[in-house]
Curated annotation (Swiss-Prot):
Span list, region Disordered: 1-39
Taxonomic lineage: Eukaryota, Fungi, Dikarya, Ascomycota, Pezizomycotina
Protein family membership: Belongs to the major facilitator superfamily.
Protein's membrane topology: Multi-pass membrane protein
Transmembrane regions listed in the UniProt entry: 50-70, 89-109, 116-136, 159-179, 193-213, 232-252, 335-355, 426-446, 459-479, 488-508, 539-559
Purpose: Probable transporter.
Protein name per its UniProtKB record: Probable transporter MCH1
GO MF, any single term: transmembrane transporter activity
Matching InterPro entries: MFS, MFS_trans_sf
Gene Ontology CC: fungal-type vacuole membrane
Locations listed in the record: Vacuole membrane
Residue ranges, compositional bias (Polar residues): 1-29
Glycosylation-annotated residues: N30, N515
PANTHER family linked to this entry: TRANSPORTER MCH1-RELATED, UNCHARACTERIZED NODULIN-LIKE PROTEIN
Amino acid sequence: MSSSAPDDTQASRLDADQISTRSSSYASDNDTDSTETRIQRNKEKQAIRLLAFISANIIALACGSIVVFSLYAPLLQSRLHYSQFQVNAVAISGSVALYLPISGVGYICDRVGLKPLALTGGILFGSGYGLAAGVYRKLDLEYRSHPEYRVDNDWSLPFLMLSFVFVGVATCCLYMAAVSSCAKNFGKGRYRGLALATPITCFGLSPMWLSQAGTRLFTETRPDGSKGDLDVFRFFLFLAALTFFMGILGTFTLRVVDEDELIDEAIEELEQSGLLDGSSLLGRTERSYGATGEETESSALLDPSKDNAKWKKNWVLNAETRSFLADRTMWPFALAFLLIVGPGEAFINNLGTIIGTLTPPEMEGWSHRTSAATHVSIFGITNTASRIFIGTLTDLLAPYPHTQHVQGPSTRSAVSSRFSISRVAFMAFFASMLSIGLLILASGLVQNHAERFWLVSGLVGAGYGAIFSLTPLMVTIIWGVENFATNYGLIGMLPAAGSTFWGLVYSATYQNGANKSKAGPEGSDRDDLFCYGEQCYAPTYWAETITVWIAVGLLLWAWKGRGGWSQRGIII
């Protein structure tokens, strides 16, 4: 008996060692499986993020079609016999619809998601351009069939305006979905400026390639076989099909990866910076833990984890929206954006008719040395180059905070001691560049010298593009990425007022000049539709130049003024 006891003890130890070995083996296997699972999940997330990035850029490359309005604006005058006021009414409808709903679109984007916006944008694009094609075709055929008497075109204006309202809202939806996906998916990286600038750049490229496609692929054929004017009907049908497909593409590919983690990080940083009181959020969580059995059972049926996550997200986003609106520096920043972008929008909308005022009617044959398509392309090239250039340059030279959330007085956002240039300085520089382009036009330097007009379209395009790239980037850096679409939407809706105001001012100036110059073709009963000379545009662009200078002053005040970003320690 005594000899068997040590044997039993030894056997027990062997069994324990084997169990321990097996447990360690199982634990090791579990750790390996867990690591492999994490790696696989990270790869899947990277693939989704990359697909969303590529899709966002493709969509942005196609959805800037509203900017090529000046390509066919002269044909609305010559073919549909619209006055300058009527042409601008159509242009203003599109511009207002592009900017005015952007705050609501941004709100939906942050709280509902990207897919509904993409689908809505695709449907509205197809409907808008389809309606515009039908209206243009019907009225054009009526004028061709009855050239001997005046056709009533009053019925067409409301329908054409409605079609461009659809196009404007669709542009807003797809643009916000594309830019927001990049802002939220790449908000942590050192090169977030480049990631955000890429879809914005593609949006700037859009009018360039679309204008060239229109003038090369969708033109009428003259009796001698040469290319004639743009075939607006076919061009509208092409845009309807292209943009509708972009909406479908975005519906299936645009996603924000790890949005829940983004919200949790935002809560933590906001509480640390003192910008947010988490007591109400904690109270909500404690109530869910202290629920009765009956409440727990009912909540389980409603999936309380999802309900709490959604409530928490909305709570944080609403708190950030209130903080954004209460920030006194936001208002001069938004007003500066309005005063800069308004003149830029009015310029591109009226580019075609401006070119027509530069050359005397008796030299009409020589006017083909420059065209609206050429300058839409020049505007597009400089617009695009400045967007991608400013995104890259600010990543390399501008200071950057080590956070993707709202910057507060206590935010720990250390910055390197390397040489840096503030993004505000870049914004002021490019706004001044835009004002120089407007000044050249206002001064009459290009009058009777249409070959010099590239200076105007190039400078305005470069300034306009840089401002549109820097503004959303500064919104993400100062006020965070999680509520980006809402915050940027509140600022982005303001240019609707600027575009409308300057469009009306230009129309009044142009029409007044037309009444004086009587520059229409001889024997025409439409002499008052066309204008030639500095009086057609100079007063408008002198005023626009001054407003851009005022905007630069507002930017500098928001940066260096009392209670400005510099005094508050905000890295920008």
